[in-house]
Curated annotation (Swiss-Prot):
This is Probable translocation protein y4yO. Belongs to the type III secretion exporter family. Keywords: Cell membrane, Membrane, Plasmid, Transmembrane, Transmembrane helix, Transport. Residues 1-22 have a biased composition (Basic and acidic residues). It comes from Sinorhizobium fredii (strain NBRC 101917 / NGR234). Residues 1-25 are annotated as: Disordered. The chain crosses the membrane at residues 87-107, 151-171, 189-209. InterPro entries: T3SS_substrate_exporter (IPR006135), T3SS_substrate_exporter_C (IPR029025).
Length: 345
């Protein structure tokens, strides 16, 4: 059965998701990023609303004073006030928006993702058949549903709010500065409603995009088998790996820290391991020559190992015995005497 005729009923493996992430294929939620940025901006306006209100009130009051001043002086004062108002409101607002976009993108993408793969030319992007296929996909249906939801819910919420404030807005020119605080209070309420609605919509979109992405990344049984085969290799390769692991497991652990008796000769050091009930005969677990022998000797001293000076036996063991193997039978007697003297046998 071919891959095209099989049903993609299995979830994507971690390897497939990791490879897709390296290619820049991740669930993207632009609504969540926009909602986070908008909430940051609205939150800033909410927290700094009183300061902005005072600045705007000051600008409106200054308008009457500027009418009686010479034109050049009036323009200069108006520009100074405009710059102060911009720095006090727009500057922090842009910083909040920029920071929120970066943070929301990192949260939505679960870290920083950089890939040039999406920028490469792809014929499928301009293929009309692929476009028609995407048009009838579940993702397109979800996008249409999201658009309708935003239009109906957000539009209805804002409409109800404006209906409650329409009388205030109508009498605002007559009311003058006395209604200025009412307008800002209403604006804060509108900000709170809008921020809450946008954030909820962004979180819902984030969950939807992840669910759709995992749905698109589903695999067939054949794809899973192929991936497993690529990871583990052919049966022959797996058998060879198993054989090497078994050989390594059967070999005794080596190193001076495994030794119980050390023989030292001229520029030669031999380490043997013999533990009653564990090893039937002494095993050669370490050996060194030259500078390495000096380093190993100091390490053996630090480990408080029994050290025997025997130049002849040390050189004989060095030339006749391999690491991890038992000592030859002809050396049993002198080594047994050393073990007895050290209280190891």
């Amino acid at each position: 059965m071919s891959d095209t005729s099989e049903e993609k009923s299995h979830g994507a493996t971690p390897k497939k998701l990791s490879d897709a992430r390296k290619r820049g294929q991740i669930p993207r939620s632009s609504d969540f990023v926009r909602a986070a940025a908008t909430c940051a901006g609205l939150g800033y306006l909410w927290l700094r609303g009183s300061v902005i209100e005072d600045k705007c009130r000051e600008a409106l009051l200054l308008t009457d004073k500027l009418q009686n001043l010479p034109f050049n002086l009036a323009v200069r004062q108006a520009l100074v006030l405009l710059v102060e108002l911009t720095l006090a409101t727009v500057g922090p607002l842009l910083s909040a928006l920029f920071g929120a976009v970066i943070l929301a993108a990192l949260l939505a993408n679960r870290g920083f993702v950089f890939s040039l793969e999406p920028m490469k030319p792809n014929f499928d992007k301009i293929n009309p058949f692929q476009w028609l296929k995407r048009l009838g996909s579940a993702r397109s249906a979800v996008e249409v549903g999201k658009t309708l939801f935003k239009v109906l819910v957000l539009g209805g919420t804002f409409s109800l709010f404006f209906l409650g404030l329409w009388k205030t807005m109508v009498y605002l020119p007559v009311c003058g500065m006395g209604c200025f605080g009412v307008v800002f209070t209403g604006a804060k309420q509108l900000i709170g409603i809008g921020a809450g609605a946008l954030l909820i919509g962004g979180l819902i979109d984030l969950l939807l995009q992840r669910a759709l992405f995992l749905r698109e990344m589903r695999m067939t049984k054949t794809e899973i088998k192929r991936e497993l085969k690529e990871q583990q290799g052919t049966p022959e390769l797996k058998g060879e790996r198993r054989r090497i692991r078994n050989e390594m497991a059967s070999e005794p652990p080596l190193g001076v820290h495994r030794a119980t008796l050390v023989y030292r000769g001229t520029a030669v050091l031999i380490g043997l391991r013999y533990v009653r009930g564990e090893t039937g005969v002494p095993i050669l677990v370490c050996r060194a020559e030259g500078e390495a022998a000096s380093d190993m000797f100091r390490e053996a001293q630090n480990l408080r190992l029994k050290i025997v000076d025997d130049h002849v036996l040390a050189h004989q063991l060095m030339s006749t015995t391999k690491l991890g193997t038992a000592i030859p039978m002809q050396y049993f007697e002198p080594i047994a005497r050393a073990l007895l003297a050290a209280g190891l046998a």
